[in-house]
């Protein structure tokens, strides 16, 4: 049974250890998916491998590299002069993320989702290169978040110019009723 009340906070050392384990876990996923893809497409089916196979491998490697590097830079700890842990880095395992109301595009959960999506697509593409079309879910999700959190509220916000605000004193003087 979950404890009632406010959730406990994590200490710097716990965040540091969990981040290290999280990065290790995602590195294993990256290496495993890349090894399966390379073994199947670039070793077993080498004669049938086309330029698209090599391009897909390069693309997935670039996505993995960028996502993993971003996650590791977020989780980079800071140490004091005496070698003690001063800051454990950003918690990569937060439930709500940095800002629950407006998700940041480089939030750790989105980067982890990109790594997992790429790994699944990469392994499944051993059966068909058409599986790479599923990777279009990532920019689709990015456009959805852009619309929901930035563009949608901006387009649907009520426009009120500062000079058009009803002035109560002016309304009382002229005798016009407020709207």
Swiss-Prot record:
It is a multi-pass membrane protein. Pfam families: TMEM208_SND2. GO terms for biological process: autophagy; vacuolar protein processing. The chain crosses the membrane at residues 25-45, 51-68, 114-136. It is found in: Endoplasmic reticulum membrane. GO terms for cellular component: endoplasmic reticulum membrane; intracellular membrane-bounded organelle; vacuole. Residues 159-179 are annotated as: Disordered. It comes from the Eukaryota. The keyword rRNA-binding does not apply. Keywords: Autophagy, Endoplasmic reticulum, Membrane, Transmembrane, Transmembrane helix. The keyword rRNA processing does not apply. Belongs to the TMEM208 family. May function as a negative regulator of endoplasmic reticulum-stress induced autophagy. This is Transmembrane protein 208.
